[in-house]
Amino acid sequence: MDPRKPRQDPVNDARFYESLIKPPHLRTPDDIRNVYEQLRQLDTFSNLFIGPLKALCKTARYERHPAQYILFRDGDVARSWYILLSGSVFIENQIYMPYGCFGKRTGQNHRRTHNCLLLQESEMIVIDYPTEPQSNGMSPRTPPRGIHHSGEPVHQKTPRKSAPNMSVDSIAMPPPPVPPRPLRLPQTAAKGPAPLPPRGLPRTYPLDFPVDIPTTSSSSSNTSYNDQHRSQVYLNGLSADEDTLVRVKHRREKSNSVGGQAQNGISTARRLRGRSTASSTTTEGETASNEGADSDEDEGSMPSQESSSGGFMDLRDSVRECLEKEPSERNSEDLAVLLDFMQHMSAFAALPMSIKRQLCLKMVFAVVNDAGTVVLAHNEKLDSWSVIVNGCVEVVKPSGERVEYKLGDSFGAEPTPATQIHIGEMRTMVDDCEFVLVEHRDFCSIMSTIGDHIEKDRDGLTGEVVSEVERRTVGTHCGQVLIKGKPDKLIHHLVDERDHNVDPHYVDDFLLTYRVFIRDPTTIFEKLMLWFADSIYRDKVARLVLLWVNNHFNDFETNDEMWNLLERFEGALERDGMHSQLSLLNIACSVKAKPRQVILTRRKDDKMMMRLVGGQESGNSVYVAEVFPDTSAAREGVKRADEMLEVNQQSAKYLSAKKAEDLLTGSLSLTLMLKNNVLGYKETIGKIEHNKPKNGTSRSGAGIPMVIPVHKTSITGKKSSTTSSKSGMMEKLMTILKSSKEDSMDFTDEAKISSADLRPSRSNPDITSISQYYGPVRSECPEHVLKIYRNDQTFKYLPVYKETSAQNVVQLALQEFNMTAEGSPEWSLCECTVTIDGVIKQRRLPPQMENLAERIALNSRYYLKNNSRSEPLVPDELAPELLKEAQTQLLSLNAQVVAAQLTLQDFSVFSAIEPTEFLDNLFKLDSKYGSPKLEEFEQLFNREMWWVATEICTERHVQKRAKLIKKFIKVARYCRDLRNFNSMFAIMSGLDKPAVRRLHSSWERVSSKYIRMLDEIHQLVDPSRNMSKYRQHLAEVAQEPPVVPIYPVIKKDLTFAHDGNATYSEKLINFEKLRLIAKSIRGVMKLSSAPYEIASMAERSGGVVMDALLHMNSFENSNVATMRKGMSGKQNQPRKKVYEQALMVRKVKSYLEGLHVVDNEMELDSMSYDIEPQVQTAHRGANSSSTANIRRVPSPTPSSLSSQSAGSADQSSRHRLLFNGTGSISSAGGGSKFGVESPQAVQKMLSLVQNSKVKGAPPQITSPSTSARSSLQRNMPRVTGRQATSSAQGPVQLNEETSTVTTYYQSDNGRRQRSGSEGRFDNIPPSTFYLTSDGLTVSPRQSLSVVIPTHPHGHSPTSPRCRSRSPASSGCSSFSTIASIAATSMAAAPSAFVSNPYQHHQTVRGHVIGHRPMPIVTSGSATLPNHVSPRGLPPKSRPTILPGSHTNSSSRMGTIKEATFLTSEQVSRV
């Protein structure tokens, strides 16, 4: 393509800008349609329905602001959020590029938590939140730094540091010129060629462009029309005149993504009512140290029931709804849902996107209720192509060979017009099998057009195919998408002109996935450098490099060659005068760099290894100005612009450059903590240059490009003659960062301006470094309270900041104890600790030690000690008391605090995961960076899962065990309310361990309200249709991050996207596969794009989380947690209460850090049998017979019981094919078997569904006495133990889509693989499962923990016996097994297996069919009488399965450590 052609962008439409620029009250329906057609292409609105999106299009506004403009400040009321169209925005440590959204509210916080600076001239869409009353945390208050609407700072009564004159912010933007619109030139145009925005804009604009551009959207003055119209937008973003309110009613918990959180009277009353029932009875003592444990029987300590019933019990099954629609009734939203659901299925994996779309438009939905139904008879004509979307089927061929098809497999007609017949008999193997069918004629027509959509590009010399492109249609746009190609072609496509309407993420996907097929990234960068020399590609290459650095800075940090190329590119930007791009590059490098530890060794006669600049005397950190070659520093990777954070684990913020050099030359071994900070380094160099005499001849450093000098203003306000607009932008950026950190210092403005150096702030003395602009919690009052003792054991509570030093604490303590007459140098702060052995240790703290509240242990106290005395501060008789205070047990801890601490810890790891870690882990790449945080996140899931089982099985008292079970259910519920689904699922998995489920005496003491609570959580993770309910809910809450997703689901999606698609196809890179993986990773990364405001999220569910949770947690990441603004009402809390709250958090942290978990299934079984021995029955055979006779009646289809689907009952009666247990169609029109006598099965299905009716279960009449007896036993899981003998057990396969556990068998000589339900446990050691070749591929040195959670109570809480097998039935999934993959890296499986200690139990062989284990051959309690055939099994006359030959899967087997063994009681559930 010609690079000189205009760029194509997702919103590059002059009509769009013409419509958007119009005032909202002047827009016509055509204008709204123009805005809608463009916005619907953005990822921000990908999950938004038509109604809410059109409502936004009516009120969305256009704004354009100059570079260096402060859009909003920390503390301002958030009245709107933004979508960037062009330019770039800096918010804390993140740079936002075009088409990214920013400025959204977090939870119920209605105030900004960060400053926002425009780095370039930027255009944006402004979306106002609905107006709300001033209540709910919105009481008027003066922000920490008051500003006018133009961004001009105003002086407040309390002296604060003011930013320099920012008059540039108030400059009104001129109206645009007459079309065609020329290129925009920034203020630095005189210095060099101006860069284009990262993504261009249309070249023509309307003439009636408004001259008066609106000011910041945080302005309190808005047009009266906007105020009037915004009041008409409901909470879900739907306007009053829309007719799709029912469709988005389930999204009522959403707010920000569809226009905000309107706090109307109903929602306010609901929230207040929830708090009155959920938190008002939570007394003050509940947060104290001793009374902090919430009572299990207190309703007030329970999570809010209303929040659950509204947001989780009513989850729709959107996939089912879309499938049940007539093909002609499906719209674009339905199509998007179906494409997302089908993309992971093997039948669709190799098909082009255009073919998938056509198939989804033609497919019809069919349901087979009962297992054993004949779906296709032998020699029956095939008139459709079918895909299994739930369940599995089996084909028995005339030769006796059996072939099984599982979820995602296809069968039926081939895409040829010839008549085809089916060989063999196909039967369903489980209940509720679901299929999608495409008529043979339509299937042939669609598949015949594959060649029409694919174009191949061949080399002009060799004729070899170098790329394949597919023509796709997205909305109203049609364009070509590169799907396969040679590496060189993929690289060159970075600078080719692409149609961004149909392929907007190619650059992002390539920069993430190139490592799969290119080992050396320097080849890519060198080509970019060559293209940079061409003026045609220069701006485009500059944007590519900036995007690369901003998204994957670890590619440069861990590769010295890449770092050198980046410095070359930096010099090229300076040479060509591209200062704006260079500024962005410096900012990106500074904010994305991470601290690293370097160990330097030297000999006595070695010279200096590096040259340093800065230091305390200049008000800056110590920076590395130059690294000398052939030194230890060069070999260890020390770089120019590295900031020195620590030297031998001591802070370097008070070091001067001379002192640092002395340390380097005077030590033979040094441990340095370094962090690259180009921005701070260049500011330091700029200050040095500015302070030099004009005739000075000294150099600032060899080879240091002085690109962005920052010149300070004098007292008179005159700037240096060399100050330009670029330096003004950098000065303003640094001033914003500094003022945000110094706003609580009580210094006058005059004193700060007249100071030659920047005064260190309270929160960060080294303020010149942008890398130190970290602070998840910024409070205007002291965050901590210390309890300081004297030697007479009297104490005082002292409010302190996190940065208050030990020396300051001594001074405060002397004042509190009225000892001001004594000098503070005579006193010191000591920490007295009592060890487990009763030994009292005492140490004096350094005067400069900070963060004292987090440093102290539970078995320690702070004492005020006179330096002239040597008496012991803690007498011996107090030692036992200190040890008793240090003891922590789970039952004594507050469940909500435990859940919140788990959430913060998990999110701190999850948010630190780099996107490249997923690729490195998935493809097993040999990367220098690796996947450290991803592996840590994997371990967290396993640790939390094993912790639950260990804690319960360790407790020997049955009452306490029951309380522990209830405590864990509450913690899981709170985790769900906090959107920590990972910990929620881990806790559920721990509760569903067989060692826990078998504890009958404990479960029968768990009240029904906790069982209902557990059932609600189980419904959220219903495994049917690939956990569609969880995925739907995740898609909704993902619009308002943060969220901690379920890691096993992420791992499974990535694994099957990798295994189900080839990386190479005909010597070409299958980039479509890499797109799919990159899309999944991109969605996961968005979940951690905002910090946790955990207090607001807790209030949303009716609870209250103390501020101490955030104050007592220091994280490596800056965006882990944040405080809600406007918390002044909590500043007057008593010191004692604040201390007790912090003490509870310290106890929770100490408990979680000291967890000892048992990760061995057999050991847990032994512990479980020890605390609750197996109850032996007298007549197992009779018991089995009675069990077999209690068979449930046939259950209706899930959609008939699904209350989540709007209009599901009506559509189910029209569009579902229902079959009874005998194989006949349940309809008024006939009873013939499915497809046996009909040559046109599809037409027959479509005609029969009009008259088909749902088969309901007959009502069950029970007497009150029976109900009472049943209610006493309903919470007891019917599990008798894990029985095993020396006979071997069979391996278990993991189904890709539903995460169900199915069994197959295979001998050492290579028996035929089985992916279905039948399996024999032969020749496999106990507790060992294997994966098949079409499942997860596991290396021999890795293993997977198979998590199989089930309902522990065994029965439905609403009926004595659960009647339905449908997971959609409320409370009726007790007999199903939620099988999930915890695909985590664990230790290699041992070569020798521990023998089962319970050899006297007999072996059970069984089916695992659709989540339900079913017996086929039993000995012992699970024996079935001969006349009873377990439902769902093939006939008993089925021939014995002969072993086949399948050697490939044997070579790919990996041991799954400690998997779950099915007990006889489990398989007896029929």
Curated annotation (Swiss-Prot):
Gene Ontology biological process terms in this record: collagen and cuticulin-based cuticle development; epidermis development; molting cycle, collagen and cuticulin-based cuticle; Ras protein signal transduction
Compositional bias of kind Pro residues: 173-183
InterPro entries reported for this sequence: cNMP-bd_dom, cNMP-bd_dom_sf, PDZ, PDZ_sf, RA_dom, Ras-like_GEF, Ras-like_Gua-exchang_fac_N, Ras_G-nucl-exch_fac_CS
Domain named Ras-GEF: residues: 894-1124
Record keywords: GTPase activation, Guanine-nucleotide releasing factor
Listed GO MF terms: GTPase activator activity; guanyl-nucleotide exchange factor activity
Pfam families (alphabetical): PDZ, RA, RasGEF, RasGEF_N
Annotated tissue distribution: Expressed in hermaphrodite-specific neurons (HSNs), oviduct sheath cells and lateral seam cells.
Keyword Cytoplasm appears in the UniProt entry: no
Protein name from the UniProt record: Rap guanine nucleotide exchange factor
Species assigned in the record: Caenorhabditis elegans
Encoding gene per record: pxf-1
